[in-house]
Design a protein with these regions (language model features):
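Export/targeting segments at the very N-terminus of extracytoplasmic proteins
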Residues: 2-48, 69-89
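Short, functionally critical alpha-helical segments immediately adjacent to catalytic or ligand/cofactor-binding
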Residues: 39-54, 86-103, 122
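Conserved small/polar residues in nucleotide/adenosyl-binding loops
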Residues: 147-151
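Short, solvent-exposed loop/turn and secondary-structure capping segments
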Residues: 54-61, 133-134
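Short, surface-exposed glycine/acidic/tryptophan-bearing loops
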Residues: 59-68, 122
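Substrate-binding clefts and substrate-entry loops adjacent to catalytic sites
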Residues: 6-9, 128-146
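A structural motif
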Residues: 110-136
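Structural motif
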Residues: 32-39, 108-114, 144-146
Length: 156
């Protein structure tokens, strides 16, 4: 089965880059055997959920203090703690992703470096490493490749 441009428009009505996404998906989906209605639906649904309809390709961590307490209560137990991180995405990433998913501690900067990116919002040094290994590149190259792809996908 092939995903048509019209189907993609119906699934992603607010996305201004349908032509580019359709071209990319038409080339890549068959390579990964995403070729049945069920597989295509699952893939598109997961990616659309993670990326806000194929629009946000880098995790948005620009939270107000009140939201930090609600969304990340494990890390922000009270509003006073959250205020120190409010509207500081890099600092937030380094706190919430510290010492997990292969990342170092908060001071390592790994949380920010390996924050969610791409349609699936790949997150964490371990996941970047697995992704990089599948492409025979280093995690740092995967980070640069992801950043480059995310910033240029609409200009191709």
């Amino acid at each position: 089965m092939e995903l048509t441009k019209e189907q993609l428009k119906q699934l992603l009505p607010k996305n201004p880059y349908i032509d580019q996404w359709h071209k990319a998906l038409s080339q890549l989906l068959p390579d990964y055997e995403i070729n049945t209605p069920q597989r295509i639906a699952a893939f598109i649904a997961q990616c659309a959920h993670e990326s806000g309809g194929f629009i946000f390709l880098t995790e948005n961590l620009n939270y107000k203090a009140e939201s930090l307490v609600k969304v990340f209560p494990k890390y922000f137990k009270d509003i006073t703690t959250a205020k120190a991180y409010e509207k500081k995405p890099e600092k937030i990433a380094n706190k919430i992703y510290a010492n997990r998913m292969g990342n170092g501690d908060e001071l390592s900067g790994d949380g920010w470096k390996y924050r969610g990116r791409g349609l699936i919002q790949l997150t964490g040094k371990t996941n970047y490493s697995w992704f990089a290994a599948s492409l025979n590149i280093t995690p740092d190259e995967a980070d640069r490749k992801s950043t480059r792809l995310n910033s240029s996908h609409v200009s191709e």
